[in-house]
Every structure is written in C-alpha cells, then in structure tokens.
Design a protein with these regions (language model features):
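Sec-dependent bacterial lipoprotein signal peptides
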Residues: 1-20
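Membrane-proximal, proline-rich intrinsically disordered regions
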Residues: 22-79, 321-322, 330-335, 343, ...
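Short, surface-exposed recognition loops and adjoining beta-strand edges that mediate ligand/DNA contacts
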Residues: 37-41, 65-87, 168-183, 224-307, ...
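Hydrophobic-face positions in mid-chain alpha helices that act as interaction patches
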Residues: 49, 71, 233, 257-397, ...
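Conserved, well-structured interaction surfaces
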Residues: 91-168, 202, 219-227, 385-392, ...
Length: 464
C-alpha cells in the first residue's frame, strides 16, 4: 500500500473529474504544485482533495491488467464467486472461483487486491478525519463544503470496514461478535507513521461499533446540509443505503427497514421501468442510480476501465473473454416478459443477439457462438462500440426495495413485504402479480428477484 503522497498529492485546482484513469498513482503531481502529507491534512484545500481522491479511487483504482478499474470491477469479481454464475468455456477470469480464491497468495490475486483497496480508502479517511477534528480551526470546520467532505469521509470509512469484515472475518453474530476475530483496526487516532505499522486484529464487535458510529456521524452531518445533486458524491440517501446494507448483514431487521425507507424517500431517484433497464448501465443520470461515477470528457479511459473489461459491445476490449452466464436455476423462473431476460443471452431461448455485440463473441464452435451459451451476461454496454466511454455504478435504488422487502418479511410483516416486492418487480415485469407467499417462501421469492436484479453488482457474494 502506497503512502499518502503517492495517492493523494493534490494539485491546486484539481477537481474530481479531471484525474487520469488508468494509473495507480492517479493523483500524483509534480512536487512544485502538490500538497504534502501535512498540507493535505492541515488545510481546507487538502481535506477536500483527500475526499475527492477517495471518490477517484472508487472508479479509477488500478487493480492490474485485465481486472478492470475501481470498485465496480471488484464487485463483479466477487460475484463471479457466487452461486449465481456459471462457466463452462475457457475464460480469462476462470481463476476467480470461490475455492481458488481462498488458496491464492501474492499481490496480484483478489485477496490482496480487496484488502489493499479497502485499507487504502481507510488510511486516507483516517487522515482526513484526523485533520478535520484536530487541525482545522472551529471556523474552518463550520464551512459547509468542509463539513460535507468530512461527512463523506466518515461514510467512506464505514463502507470500507463493512466490506472488509464481510470478506476477511466471520459474519456478524450478536452472541459471538465480542470474541470473533475481525479485521485490523486503524483509526484517526493514529499518527501517519502508525497508520502503516503492524496493528492488532480487532473483534467483529469493535469493527461494527466504529462502522455504526461513523454512519451516524455521516448521516447527522449530511442530512442538515444542501445535498450535492451529483451522484458521484455521497449524499444523505446514499449513506442511508450503506446503513441499510450494514443493518441487513447484522440481522437488525427493524433498522434495515428504516434505513432502506429513508434511502428511498431521500434519494431523488426512481425505479427504471421496462426498456429503460436496457441502457447498458453506462449513464449515471439514469433514474435508478443512487451512487455512481462519470469520467470527464478529457479523460482517456483506454482499456483499463470497468466497461472496457466487461461490456459486450466495446471493440477490441477484454470482454470477449468474459464468458460467464447466469445460473439457469434462477433465470428460468423469470416471467416470460420480464425485461431482465435481455440482460442474458441463452442460446436455447431463440433470442436475438444484439447487433453491436463484439466480434470476439461470434466465431462459431460446432455451430454455436463462441460465448457462454447457457446465459451469457450482456448487461453492460459502452455508449459507443469504438470507445470505452461510460459511467460506472455503485448503488441502485432497486437494491433498497429488496432490502426493505426482506427486512419486512423477516419481521413477519408479510403484507408489507409483498407490496414492496411487487412495487419493484412490476417495473421489470409488467405481468408480475402481487405475491401471495408468506414466511420463508416469500423471503425466497424476494431473494430470487434480488439475485437476478443485482447480479455482478457486488451483492450476491455477500448474501450467500
């Protein structure tokens, strides 16, 4: 993991959307125009720069050749290890299997990449939070832009620790969390040197105490401020979405319901309907997006981006090796007219292949196409087949409805859960009728649609 000056040297006037995209040191600038560690921590400009750097990491962090950049690529790779993905053909990503990932070592495997990514976020949030609390003056801390950035920093730290605990520790269990080994705990109380020294492994309970404290601080801070309408910033509704995920993981059903409802009510987003969901997931102004990122027009996105790696229509990308299909055990339960069927190509369903699909998918092998014919993923598309241009997704409104529905069902609120599930699925399948299932059967139905809706968005692996 590289130090602050390698990741977050902020040139004067640099904004979030003017940062290069395909290099790990994407915020490094010349020494004559950059801010050092102390300057970054001790000034308003530095705090804003650190938080902008965190956002840049979310879409531009370089995981290495062929992996794809940023959190969306890591989310997709995690879902490759879930039970909803099928592979029967040679594919460049075949090494990312559940058992294989447990045995891999080195700095070019998913274990290291996930650890490094989330802890790099944490290290820099610690520096930002420490500077806000201990270095800025009271008047500086009252500045609305500074308060907003501080709120985002707290939310980022909670998000990153929650991801780490799910990946590298036991799932939260209220009866054992106080003794279950969690992850290494680093906070803003450490000095810069201490942030990179060996530290003890905390418990799962300690991790979630910090996560929930950070989320509370972030929500209290952001709720009282004018919301940044850009979806490449964390807003009050986005933090409520993170809190809903955390509560669901902890089996705190009442809190999960509350936070999901709060996210929905304040998101300034709405569910996409029918063909709107076939937009290729490449435009962060899409109605349903809550959190995503847009590259600047001047940025050379090249071959390292998420869409260059995983879209189905970018010429000369890596995607013709992305031969992974949806599990037909769940896909075949979709309604005949469910628009989500078009996110997957099933050779036996007599579907039309999209006209602009990359030629690498098309060579025939024994009379069949060269992709994963059981249900090839075609969910992601670039805006123009000759360019890797396109926005990247972190959180959608639909997820909040599924969290709310599950939380309601877990509390025995079957009628409410049925209505919530109907509300979201009806936008995907015009023929969908109000569910009548109750109890475990209703929960299974909620999971079915959540699994299909959010596959490759980094949700299913954690739900397993």
């Amino acid at each position: 993991m590289k130090r602050l000056h390698k990741y977050l040297a902020i040139a004067a006037g640099v904004t979030l959307l003017t940062l290069p995209a395909c290099k790990k040191d994407f915020l490094e600038t010349s020494s004559t125009t950059s801010l050092g560690d102390k300057q970054a921590e001790g000034t308003q400009e530095g705090l804003l720069g650190i938080v902008n750097g965190l956002h840049s990491m979310m879409y531009a962090y370089n995981f290495g050749q062929g992996f794809g950049a940023g959190a969306p690529s890591l989310n997709l790779r995690l879902d490759l290890m879930s039970d909803d993905v099928i592979n029967t053909q040679p594919a460049s990503l075949r090494e990312y299997t559940y058992l294989g990932a447990h045995n891999e070592r080195g700095d070019d495997v998913i274990n290291f990449r996930a650890w490094d990514f989330y802890y790099t976020l944490i290290q820099h949030t610690n520096i930002a939070i420490r500077g806000f609390k201990n270095t800025l003056t009271e008047d500086q801390r009252k500045d609305k832009k500074i308060r907003y950035s501080a709120g985002e920093a707290y939310a980022f730290r909670a998000y990153a620790y929650h991801q780490l605990v799910q990946l590298f520790a036991k799932r939260y269990n209220a009866s054992t969390a106080a003794s279950d080994p969690g992850v290494v705990m680093r906070t803003d109380e450490a000095t810069n040197a201490q942030l990179y020294e060996k530290a003890r492994r905390g418990t799962v309970a300690e991790a979630y105490e910090l996560i929930e404290s950070d989320l509370k601080m972030a929500m209290e801070t952001l709720k009282d401020l004018d919301q940044n309408n850009s979806r490449n910033h964390l807003r009050y509704s986005t933090v409520c979405g993170i809190a809903a995920r955390v509560a669901l993981c902890k089996s705190d059903w009442a809190a999960a319901e509350t936070y999901a409802k709060e996210a929905i009510a304040n998101a300034n987003s709405k569910l996409q309907v029918g063909e709107e969901l076939l937009d290729g997931f490449n435009d962060y102004t899409a109605n349903e997006w809550m959190w995503g990122y847009r590259y600047a027009e001047t940025q050379n996105q090249g071959y390292g981006t998420f869409l260059a790696t995983y879209s189905t229509n970018f010429d000369n990308g890596w995607q013709d090796h992305f031969r992974f299909a949806v599990n037909r055990n769940i896909f075949d339960q979709l309604g005949t007219n469910d628009v989500r069927r078009k996110w997957w190509y099933c050779y036996d369903q007599d579907q039309n292949i999209p006209e602009d699909v990359d030629a690498g998918y098309l060579p025939l092998i024994s009379g069949t196409p060269g992709f994963e014919i059981t249900g090839q993923c075609m969910k992601y598309r670039v805006q123009n087949h000759a360019s890797s241009k396109g926005d990247v997704l972190i959180m959608r409104l639909g997820e909040m409805y599924y969290i709310q529905a599950e939380a309601e069902a877990r509390q025995g609120k079957d009628a409410a859960a049925q209505t919530t599930l109907y509300t979201v699925v009806k936008t995907r399948d015009a023929d969908f009728v109000q569910p009548t299932e109750t109890g475990d059967a209703l929960i299974e139905k909620i999971f079915l649609h959540k699994r299909l809706d959010l596959l490759f968005e980094g949700v299913r692996f954690f739900d397993m």
